[in-house]
């Protein structure tokens, strides 16, 4: 199986383009085009007492990416049941190359290096980390690659033999975009923790607020699940009526608020922790693409969340570290619920080179 990941990371485009003005006297600028520079400066203005801007134009990085995905399907009521699924962990490795705000990478699945095998998974992640704004775009599709991690079929049914069984009746496709605004952008740097394009020099925190959109599609073969249950448990188990569906689609619009903190615990070292909670309104759709419930319903509100954690050593030229992004989405109806947790864990080491004009003769931190 081949696992190819294309990562487009727009590393602080606004800050990188205007970084020179943060630590040197601004040169006279002609009126022509000066409005663009003022706009860029407005979006990337940071206090260099707190944040050291990028010194280089080019970057080279090696990164390992471990992907985690967990799904829990459950029903409610006196005959409530639950099944938890997750695929085998993916570990991918590859090089990345960047110029200022463009970062491109190519990774392969270390579990199977046969480049001619087709993977049942496809993942695309893109992130923008700028001084004032941030954005995430992600698409994930997993087809028949899940294993049962736990199951509850009733008080008198021992489901231990189901644990670890491969299940080829679950297909999941999820597409989403998140946009957020960083309030204390002059003193706090998200790129320092997750894009390695600046350095946080003094510990600092900030509140954030954002908007998000999510489109989720779940295909579930309940007949295959009943057959697998009989095969592994040696008895026929009837799935609850809430599980007897073939497809569920829902769209989610959310508003989020969160807090992030950059802790500079030693010279050139940084630890970042960020948590955001979102209130999302989800509208589900039936298999014939018609809305199940076209009217407003308070029960369609759910709580979602996203966490970002990172530790990095960066002296502006060399850097190394690890980061994790975890997302949690919840969908609840009167008889059925789906909970999804997925994320990436990254370990990387890299080099910046090609000093920018103002830093060609400057020593690193």
Task: Put a short name on every predicted segment.
Residues 84-92, 146-152, 161-174, 218-230, ...:
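Extracellular/periplasm-exposed beta-strand and loop segments of Gram-negative cell-envelope proteins
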Residues 31, 35-39, 43-56, 184-205, ...:
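Short loop/turn motifs that connect adjacent beta-strands in outer-membrane beta-barrel proteins
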């Amino acid at each position: 199986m081949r696992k190819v990941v294309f990562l487009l990371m727009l590393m602080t485009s606004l800050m990188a383009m205007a970084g020179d003005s943060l630590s040197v006297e601004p040169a006279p600028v002609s009126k022509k085009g000066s409005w663009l520079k003022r706009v860029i400066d407005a979006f990337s203005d940071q206090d260099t007492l707190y944040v050291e801007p990028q010194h280089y134009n080019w970057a080279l990085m090696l990164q390992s990416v471990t992907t985690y995905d967990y799904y829990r399907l459950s029903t409610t009521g006196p005959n409530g049941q639950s099944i938890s699924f997750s695929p085998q962990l993916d570990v991918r490795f590859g090089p990345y190359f960047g110029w200022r705000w463009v970062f491109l990478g190519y990774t392969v699945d270390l579990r199977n290096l046969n480049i001619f095998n087709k993977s049942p998974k496809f993942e695309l992640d893109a992130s923008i980390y700028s001084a004032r704004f941030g954005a995430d775009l992600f698409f994930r599709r997993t087809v028949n690659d899940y294993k049962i991690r736990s199951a509850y079929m009733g008080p008198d049914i021992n489901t231990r033999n189901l644990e670890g069984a491969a299940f080829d009746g679950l297909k999941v496709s999820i597409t989403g975009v998140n946009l957020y605004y960083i309030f204390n952008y002059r003193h706090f740097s998200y790129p320092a923790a997750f894009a390695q394009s600046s350095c946080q020099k003094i510990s600092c925190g900030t509140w954030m607020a954002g908007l998000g959109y999510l489109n989720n599609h779940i295909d579930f073969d309940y007949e295959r699940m009943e057959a697998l249950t009989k095969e592994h448990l040696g008895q026929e188990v009837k799935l609850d009526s809430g599980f007897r569906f073939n497809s569920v689609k829902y769209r989610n619009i959310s508003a989020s608020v969160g807090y992030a903190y950059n802790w500079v615990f030693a010279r050139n070292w940084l630890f970042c922790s960020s948590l955001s909670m979102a209130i999302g309104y989800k509208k589900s759709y039936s298999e014939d693409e018609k809305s199940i419930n076209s009217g407003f319903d308070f029960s369609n509100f759910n709580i979602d969340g996203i966490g970002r954690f990172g530790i990095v050593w960066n002296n502006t030229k060399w850097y190394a570290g690890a980061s994790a992004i975890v997302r949690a989405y919840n969908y609840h109806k009167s008889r059925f619920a789906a909970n999804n947790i997925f994320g990436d864990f990254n370990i990387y080491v890299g080099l910046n080179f090609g000093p920018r004009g103002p830093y060609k003769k400057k020593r690193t931190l």
